[in-house]
Amino acid sequence: EVHNFACLGKPDPGGCAHYIYRRYYYV
């Protein structure tokens, strides 16, 4: 998902990272 990649590229993927991980785990 582009959104996920965008979050990872951010300088502070703390909250984003959590969301991505949760999404991945859920999937």
From Swiss-Prot:
The lineage of its organism: Eukaryota, Metazoa, Ecdysozoa, Arthropoda, Chelicerata. It comes from the Eukaryota. Inhibits bovine trypsin and human neutrophil elastase. Keywords: Protease inhibitor, Secreted, Serine protease inhibitor. GO terms for cellular component: extracellular region. This is Kunitz-type serine protease inhibitor 3. GO terms for molecular function: serine-type endopeptidase inhibitor activity. Transmembrane segments: none annotated.
